[in-house]
């Protein structure tokens, strides 16, 4: 099985967790962040790590987007950077863009820009933990 490489933009806790899980499962991952220290620290968990400002369309184009089918935009805390990067990725024609949103409004804007999959990590994790807890409660009660 040949798995297409994935680009992860934003190597904070969410981005590096996602990227390292992908690489440990055999996926080639290009990690991108504007912070050189973060890129340096993340490099061991990635196939390739690059310092670049993804809000700059020219800088993003230099990363070889034509070869990338899947991008995860893991920048959530910086609304402007998230929106600019999402716009650049969509305009570049990336066929599968996932993006992290920190609020319903942020998610709505990302969808309006054309992002294919919007992820709300805290909301989604809260729901998942609630379902796990409910399963345990039902199992342990007579």
Give residue ranges: language-model regions:
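Conserved acidic E/D residue at the C-terminus of a beta-strand in Rossmann-like folds
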Residues: 33-34, 101
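Glycine-rich Rossmann-fold phosphate-binding loop(s) that bind the pyrophosphate
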Residues: 11-12
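Short beta-strand element of Class I
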Residues: 28-29, 97
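Aromatic pocket-lining residues of Rossmann-like dinucleotide-binding sites
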Residues: 22
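Phosphate-bearing ligand-interacting subdomains
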Residues: 40-133
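Residue-level detector of conserved catalytic or cofactor/ligand-binding positions
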Residues: 134-142
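Beta1/beta-strand and adjacent pyrophosphate-binding region of the FAD-binding site
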Residues: 4-8
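N-terminal Rossmann-fold NAD(P) dinucleotide-binding loop
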Residues: 15
């Amino acid at each position: 099985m040949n798995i297409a490489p994935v680009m992860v933009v934003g190597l904070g806790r969410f981005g590096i967790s996602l990227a390292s899980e992908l690489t440990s499962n055999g996926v080639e991952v290009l990690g991108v962040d504007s912070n050189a220290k973060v890129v340096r620290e993340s490099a061991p968990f990635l196939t390739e790590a690059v310092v670049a400002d993804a809000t700059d369309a020219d800088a993003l184009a230099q990363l070889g987007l034509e070869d990338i089918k899947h991008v995860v935009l893991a920048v959530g805390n910086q609304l402007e950077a998230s929106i600019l990067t999402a716009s650049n990725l969509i305009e570049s024609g990336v066929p599968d863009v996932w993006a992290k949103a920190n609020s319903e409004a942020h998610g709505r804007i990302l969808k309006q820009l054309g992002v294919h999959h919007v992820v709300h990590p805290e909301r989604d994790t809260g729901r998942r933990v609630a379902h796990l807890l409910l399963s345990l409660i039902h199992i342990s009660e007579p």
